[in-house]
Amino acid sequence: RYPFLLVDKIIDLSESHVVGVKNITFNEGFFQGHFPGNPVFPGVLQIEAMAQTGGILALSTVADPGNWDTYFLKIEEAKFKSKVVPGDTLLIKMELLAPIRRGICQMQGTIYVGNKIVSEAGLTAQIVKRS
């Protein structure tokens, strides 16, 4: 949700994977301080973009996704291979590693700029129905 939405659109969604797109623009507020005169899209926000994209995959498995929340439980093996700058378009791929059981889902995330991997991580989340 705005103002913390880090996925512009979903371009592919199946039972086992999802692909989202995020266009990085200089207008993003965090570029004022990260870093002045040398804008770099923060790695922690790349992980958040993976989490948001993965949340769409996880919630696509329930009948009424608007009544569920996704909570991320674990981030593993996060790697940042190249910096992301204004003008880049991120292709965010999330793959389900095993069937969702008891609301727990394990995913592998990879972010590309063009054909180049810029970051990757394993994420574990839980989907919970709102009471």
Label each PLM-derived region with a short phrase.
Residues 24, 37, 41, 47, ...:
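Short, electropositive, low-hydrophobicity segments enriched in small/polar residues
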